[in-house]
Regions:
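Short Pro-Cys-Gly-centered "Cys-loop" motif that presents a nucleophilic cysteine in a tight turn
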Residues: 1-57, 66-258
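N-terminal functional module of multi-domain proteins
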Residues: 62-64
């Protein structure tokens, strides 16, 4: 059963990443990626968790989810990763590990940082040169976010819009498409380790609050500047007396795109 790094705080957005064992391309075939997405739908329904975005590659997955309770994340990942791995091994007459031991979770602040994380996830296959635009890759959230996928949907668009303080799905789609095209046009698609290696990403106040709420962790480090800060394992501990308030961080200007 896959295990996470257990940096969980209730009522947060999590970017979950997990690699196939030894970076093997165990998801390279379309029917395997489709089977994984089917298991995603089943697990979302089972644990009533809000899946906001995803991208399946040939050797790892990105899942962006919002959970009110930390147990939802653990149960969700055990069902998706564990049951899919067992099914795969049975079909392929295979034994041994399917996933690397632990999946990684990065807590993402709502609003601006959520949009940036979604953009990063969407451009994953472009970074490795497989496609030029996420519309060319079937196994990602782009098609559902843009309204192209009508059947077998897995994303919770209502919760996503709430976390972005956006009332109009058309505004979201216009801004989302513009951001993707702008980064593609400027070739701004380099890997950014903070989205997949940090414990939390957001404003300075947000990551400080997350650091306080992670119990039993004595070695944490906060780095960044401006509005972009990250929390990671390190040598410094922080104490902030307040809980995270997502309502203060959801404001996002949706009319920036031309």
């Amino acid at each position: 059963v896959p295990r996470g790094n257990r940096y969980f705080v209730p009522g947060q957005i999590y970017h979950l990443t997990h690699r196939c064992h030894n970076r093997q391309f165990l998801l390279r075939f379309a029917h395997d990626k489709n089977a994984y997405r089917k298991k995603l739908r089943e697990a979302v329904s089972e644990f009533e968790l809000a899946l906001l975005d995803y991208c399946q590659t040939s050797n790892h997955v990105h899942l962006l989810a919002f959970a009110e309770e930390t147990e939802q994340i653990s149960g969700f990942m055990q069902m998706v990763e564990g049951e899919f791995a067992q099914s795969y091994n049975r079909r392929k007459h295979r034994s041994g590990a399917y996933w690397d031991d632990r999946f990684h979770s990065t807590t993402i602040q709502s609003g601006q940082h959520l949009v940036e994380c979604m953009t990063y996830i969407a451009l994953n296959m472009g970074r490795c040169g497989v496609v030029q635009h996420p519309r060319e890759w079937d196994w990602c959230g782009y098609h559902e976010l843009m309204g192209f996928r009508k059947r077998f949907r897995v994303l919770d668009i209502t919760t996503l819009l709430s976390l972005l303080a956006c009332d109009d799905i058309s505004d979201f789609r216009r801004q989302y498409e513009w951001r993707l095209n702008e980064k593609i046009a400027r070739s701004v698609m380099a890997r950014e380790p903070r989205w997949t290696e940090a414990i939390a990403v957001g404003s300075e106040s947000f990551v400080r609050q997350i650091a306080t709420l992670i119990k039993g962790r004595q070695s944490l480090e906060i780095t960044g500047e401006g509005e972009n800060w990250s929390l990671k394992e390190g040598e410094t501990s922080y104490h902030v007396p307040h809980r995270v308030n997502h309502k203060e961080s959801r404001s996002f200007q949706w009319d920036e795109a031309p």
